Amino acid sequence: MKKIFLMRHSIPEKGDMPNEQIPLSEEGKALAVSKRNIFSNVDRCFSSPYRRAMETAEFIADHPVIVKELHERTIGDAREDFWLKQYEDHDFRNPGGESLNQVKVRMKTAIDSIVGQMKEGETALVVSHATAICAYLLSYCEIEVKDAANKARKISFHGKEILNGRFQPADGFEILFEND
């Protein structure tokens, strides 16, 4: 069996800068450091190339590997509030942006590649982004919007609730891969 911990990056700074360059806040750095002991036994660590994800991974594990395809969904030209709409229609996308289905395929390809590199019995930490992770989970889970204004979701796997609320920074999911 192979195990992946799929984690959202820690708390980012607020500010006006390109999405991929947003660093962790001081609170986010402290939260990431607090996770180091929990993940001290991971064999490998992979990260989105976005700064906040890389910083999270670097605070938790030694020598994270950057995987370009783990980046956050490309929003494009958002002319309307699209957060709820993307969950109502997984093919919806803003001009120049990605749909949840496109992100799901990209993330699944990246994670399948990571799992393919792992040896039996290994554990990996994968640091990415809330929407990208949720898009990946659409391959296996039901996702229902509970409160669009607060970006709250209910995620269920085979009828069992695994998240009900906001996907918090430095939180995530444990995924087991058997007989791949």
Regions found by a protein language model. Give the residues of each.
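Active-site-proximal alpha-helix that buttresses catalytic centers in soluble enzyme cores
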Residues: 2-65, 95-101
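Generic beta-sheet signal
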Residues: 4, 120-131
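Short active-site segment of divalent metal-dependent hydrolases/proteases
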Residues: 12, 132-133
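Glycine-rich phosphate-binding loop signature in dinucleotide/nucleotide-binding domains
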Residues: 39-41, 114-122
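Short beta-strand scaffold positions
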Residues: 47-48, 105, 127-128
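Active-site signature of alpha/beta-hydrolase-fold catalytic machinery across serine-
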Residues: 59, 135, 139
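Phosphate-handling substructures
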Residues: 60-109, 163-167
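Acidic, low-complexity terminal tails and accessory targeting/binding regions
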Residues: 72-82, 88-89, 120, 138-180
